[in-house]
Amino acid sequence: MANRLKEKYTNEVVPALTEKFNYSSVMAVPKVEKIVLNMGVGDAVSNAKNLEKAAAELALISGQKPLITKAKKSIAGFRLREGVAIGAKVTLRGERMYEFLDKLVSVSLPRVRDFHGVPTKSFDGRGNYTLGVKEQLIFPEINFDDVDKVRGLDIVIVTTANTDEESRELLKGLGMPFAK
């Protein structure tokens, strides 16, 4: 079964973007390459169980086992030593990526309190979009009763677009609710 969002991309977004930016070929149309979810767990330095719980929640949200990230450098101010596990990340591609994006846009983001759309300033100049989520409770897979601590996560949507404008149009076409 093809994903709803992927069908929408092929049938609606590609023709609309081709018309707007005059691409010579369908392959030139920007597409979503991957989505990276990152959860930095700063208090994992003192308590390793926190990282396990964060990784388990990230696995529930993404449907994929997260990679444990380790500190690159030692920072005395943060009581951090090189090689200590301090976070978890997941890279989603293909079907899972479209499923996650669909779920994020249609279910999770509307559950954010006082939500007025995602900021339009979070593009990096290369066509990628970064979004910070303050609490993991907006995702339907997370059971409210099982949560010991509210954790946020970063969501980076990497596209093949060359400019922010192309990327914005692509994400808008896929249903991303940008703030007016």
Swiss-Prot record:
HAMAP family: Ribosomal_uL5_B. The lineage of its organism: Bacteria, Bacillati, Bacillota, Bacilli, Lactobacillales. Keywords: Ribonucleoprotein, Ribosomal protein, RNA-binding, rRNA-binding, tRNA-binding. One of its GO terms (molecular function) is structural constituent of ribosome. The keyword tRNA-binding applies. Part of the 50S ribosomal subunit; part of the 5S rRNA/L5/L18/L25 subcomplex. Contacts the 5S rRNA and the P site tRNA. Forms a bridge to the 30S subunit in the 70S ribosome. This is Large ribosomal subunit protein uL5. It holds the Pfam family Ribosomal_L5. One of its GO terms (cellular component) is ribonucleoprotein complex. SUPFAM superfamilies: RL5-like. InterPro entries: Ribosomal_uL5 (IPR002132), Ribosomal_uL5_bac-type (IPR020930), Ribosomal_uL5_C (IPR031309), Ribosomal_uL5_CS (IPR020929), Ribosomal_uL5_dom_sf (IPR022803), Ribosomal_uL5_N (IPR031310). This is one of the proteins that bind and probably mediate the attachment of the 5S RNA into the large ribosomal subunit, where it forms part of the central protuberance. In the 70S ribosome it contacts protein S13 of the 30S subunit (bridge B1b), connecting the 2 subunits; this bridge is implicated in subunit movement. Contacts the P site tRNA; the 5S rRNA and some of its associated proteins might help stabilize positioning of ribosome-bound tRNAs. Belongs to the universal ribosomal protein uL5 family. Gene3D superfamilies: 3.30.1440.10. GO terms for biological process: translation.
